[in-house]
Amino acid sequence: MKNNWLTLKSLFLCVSALSASGLILSGCTENANLNVGEWSLEYDAHANGIDISKGSKLIYDNVYAAYKLADSVVSTRDYAKHHVSTKKINDHFGEGYHYEVTYTGNNLPVLVQSFYVYPTKDYVLTDFTLESTSEMASNYMAPVNVDRMPEVLNQGENNRALFIPFDNDCWIRYQSHPLTFTELTSYEVTAIFNNDDREAMVIGSVEHDSWKTGITIGKGNIYNVGSCLLYTSD
């Protein structure tokens, strides 16, 4: 894809009850926090990532965005400067807040990472854009990168991950796997769930134009997955 503007949107979803409440916002040079209902987002300036919590539970630890530029993979961790802002929104998902981190510096395209939080919804949306005054090309964008997933599910030997085959593969079936795999890649969406209490975390794409979306889950243990990567590529 060649353009001076690239965008991708993907979906976070954690299945549990939400309670509506007001907004608490604080910010400084090193971090900025957003609290909406039971959702909390915190920017970590040292890791250039976002912590996402629901209630007292950390759901995603240091979420960062990445993309391919020429032959290199660039992430938000490679940028020298950042700016955090928050504003109210009212879109077709409802009333909520737009939490935005703009990364600049090191002669890289401007990267704008956005999170959309709704106090009455049980999910968080995220996308990121790349902006440049000169032509650029990329065939890989990954809005969700987590090197080590927190333990979200209750411990149990029946924790599993859902595999969905790519749409042009007629020979592989939908299947849920115990968390004993080394790596698992699902198409468009996956669910990491406890098959006893049925609590789950769902991650997948909301919209894109012509590329395919994959969710790659790295090795953890029988109770929890390791890493998590959501990407789209040609």
Predicted regions and their residues:
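Bacterial N-terminal signal peptides that target proteins for export
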Residues: 2-14
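C-terminal motif of bacterial Sec signal peptides marking the signal peptidase cleavage site
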Residues: 26-27
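Acidic, contiguous internal or C-terminal segments within carbohydrate-active enzymes
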Residues: 97-153
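Broad, structure-driven detector of short, well-ordered beta-strand segments within folded domains
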Residues: 37-45, 111-117, 201-205, 215-217
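Bacterial N-terminal signal peptides
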Residues: 12-22
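Acidic-aromatic substrate-binding/catalytic surfaces of carbohydrate-active enzymes
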Residues: 32-101, 105, 114
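Conserved small/polar residues in nucleotide/adenosyl-binding loops
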Residues: 231-234
